[in-house]
Amino acid sequence: MESKQLKWVLLTILSLIWGSSFILIKKGLIGLTPIQLGSLRIIFSALFLVLIGYKSVSVLTKSQWKYVALTAIFGTFIPAYLFALAETEIDSSSTAILNSLTPLNTLVLGMLAFGIPFKRNQFIGICIGLLGSILLVFNGASNHPEQNYYYALLVIIASICYATNVNLIKKYLPSVAPLSITTGNFLTLLIPALVLLYCSGFFEIVAISEVQTAMGYIAILGIVGTGIANIIFFKLIQLSSPVFATSVTYLIPIVAFFWGLLDNEMLTPIQFVGAFVILIGVYLSAKK
């Protein structure tokens, strides 16, 4: 398959996988704390990747390991806990929509930190996207007083972390095999995640049936939604551009929205408008 066709196939697969991740986080939080959920997500991913990719890290040089560690922190470690904490207060559909700010943040960071030039339509897109996110958050806060929309800031911070990760990979690890990067990421994070899981009191509640059910959801999230998805994502970055790769977040809210409907989540008409405004902004920022 040609790279032009392959990148669209990978984009579609990623949108289905990551669009389903938010409902898995929501279900996992029924029996787990955010720290436990984030730690288990990393641990399940690490165990899976060690089994299939332990030989792939031998090709990494000392200088590459530095950037692998950085991408592990920004691309996985921080977001894993921020998303889990955010979904204790806001619904999974809104979380997925706010995550679609990632391409905008990728563009901004690319300009400010990595010297990537921008065009007028991209700047306009950034402004429109920010307007949409503000509309979404403030309307959600007024219509869902039981939810704490200050936690939406955690999702925005996570999207900035993702944007940092994408730019680092494109600039410093463009020729490294995706499996090597992904396996290296989770080997770096395995011990910190185990320490946090132990300190969270997880092993005192592991026998509870509700906790075991939640672990099943997070095992799927860790292996498919994190381990396999990251391999696909890193390949997509190398085949395309940082902004195209992060455009997967255009499609993620659509998948997440349908999962949310099945779980009795509802968005207000104004939130739909906010989501649409975000997508317009993202489209303009990605347009060449």
Predicted regions and their residues:
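Glycine-/small-residue-enriched transmembrane alpha-helix faces in small-molecule transporters
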Residues: 1-36, 85, 144-171, 195, ...
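Membrane-interface helix-cap regions at the ends of transmembrane helices
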Residues: 20, 24-27, 31, 45-61, ...
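Transmembrane alpha-helices of multi-pass small-molecule transport proteins
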Residues: 31-78, 105-106, 161-165, 182-203, ...
